[in-house]
A protein has these predicted regions:
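Short, Lys/Arg-enriched segments at the junction into DNA-binding effector domains
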Residues: 7, 118-179, 183
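Conserved acidic carboxylate
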Residues: 12, 36, 59
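Charged docking surfaces used in two-component/phosphorelay signaling
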Residues: 16-27
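Short hydrophobic/Thr-rich beta-strand motif most characteristic of the beta2 strand and flanking loop
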Residues: 29-37, 44
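His-Asp phosphorelay/catalytic-motif detector in bacterial-type signaling
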Residues: 49-51, 74-79, 195
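Active-site beta3 strand of CheY-like receiver
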Residues: 49-54, 59
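Basic, amphipathic DNA-recognition helix from helix-turn-helix-like DNA-binding domains
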Residues: 61-63, 69, 73, 78-139
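Positively charged, aromatic-enriched patches within helix-turn-helix-type DNA-binding elements
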Residues: 151-221, 225-228
Length: 235
C-alpha cells in the first residue's frame, strides 16, 4: 500500500550502504529499518511490519535468492533486488522467482526512491481494486483476468503472477490482436521511460509468457514484434 509513511526493510550486509540509503529514504518520507544477513531479513520480511523490502543478492547465512524463494511461499510483499551491474543472470533469476524490480549497484538513491514509489502505487492499486466489484473481467482465448480479485485463469487453472506481470497481461489483453509499444508498457506499468539498457520489461514479458504457456497447437500467446513491442495474438 502507499501511505504517508511507508515502512521499508533493507536487507544488505553492507552496513555503510544501509546507513546512507536509510538516511536518504527517510528524508524522502519513508520509515526505514535494516538487517545485515539473509536469515534475519527473511524473518523481518515475513513479520508483517513492512510495506516493501530492498534485498541484496549476496548475503551471509542465506543468499538473496533463497530469501526471496522462501518469502514467496508465504507472502506477496513487494521486493526490489539489488544486483551486480552487468550481471544479467542475477536479474533474470530474481525476476523469475518473484522480484518486482531490480536495481544494479551502484545506484542513484533518487532512482531507488522512484522505483519504490512506483511499486507501492501498484500495490495500492491492487488493494483498491480488491475492494471494488466494478472492474470488468477480461476473457480472451482461454485466459481470464479478474482485476477485482487479481486472479488469472488459463484454461480454468489459476496461475500465480507478480504485480508487474498482472498489469502487463491486463494491458496486452485489453489490446488483444494489436501491437502494444514497449515505450507505452514501460511508462504505464513500470512507470518509467524505456531505456535502451534496461531489459527488465523483456524479462517480465518472458516470465509472463512462460507462465501462460503455449496454446494446444504450440503457438505462443504473446509474440514479440522486434524493435516495436508485443502483441497478444488471437486465433
Amino acid at each position: 500500500m502507499l501511505t504517508d509513511m511507508n515502512k521499508i526493510i533493507i536487507i544488505d550486509d553492507d552496513e555503510e550502504l544501509c546507513e546512507l540509503v536509510s538516511e536518504y529514504l527517510t528524508v524522502e518520507g519513508f520509515e526505514v529499518s535494516s538487517v545485515n544477513d539473509g536469515e534475519s531479513g527473511l524473518a523481518a520480511a515475513l513479520s508483517g511490519e513492512y510495506d516493501m523490502a530492498i534485498l541484496d543478492v549476496m548475503l551471509p547465512k542465506m543468499n538473496g535468492f533463497d530469501v526471496l524463494r522462501n518469502l514467496r511461499l508465504e507472502s506477496k510483499l513487494p521486493v526490489i533486488m539489488l544486483t551486480a551491474r552487468g550481471d544479467d543472470m542475477e536479474r533474470i533469476v530474481g525476476l523469475e522467482i518473484g522480484a518486482d524490480d531490480y536495481l544494479p549497484k551502484p545506484f542513484n538513491p533518487r532512482e531507488l526512491a522512484a522505483r519504490l514509489r512506483a511499486i507501492l502505487r501498484r500495490a495500492a492499486g491492487d488493494e483498491s481494486e480488491g475492494s471494488s466489484d466494478t472492474t470488468e473481467k477480461i476473457s480472451v482465448d482461454g485466459v481470464e483476468l479478474t482485476p477485482a480479485s487479481r486472479v488469472v485463469l488459463v484454461d480454468g487453472v489459476e496461475i500465480n503472477l507478480t504485480s508487474v506481470e498482472f498489469e502487463l497481461l491486463r494491458a496486452l489483453l485489453s489490446e488483444a490482436g494489436k501491437v502494444v509499444r514497449k515505450e507505452d508498457l514501460s511508462e504505464s506499468v513500470l512507470e518509467r521511460k524505456l531505456s535502451a539498457f534496461d531489459r527488465s520489461l523483456d524479462m517480465h514479458i518472458s516470465n509472463l509468457r512462460k507462465k501462460l504457456g503455449t496454446r494446444s497447437d504450440g503457438s505462443d500467446r504473446i509474440k514479440t514484434i522486434r524493435s516495436v513491442g508485443y502483441i497478444y495474438t488471437l486465433v
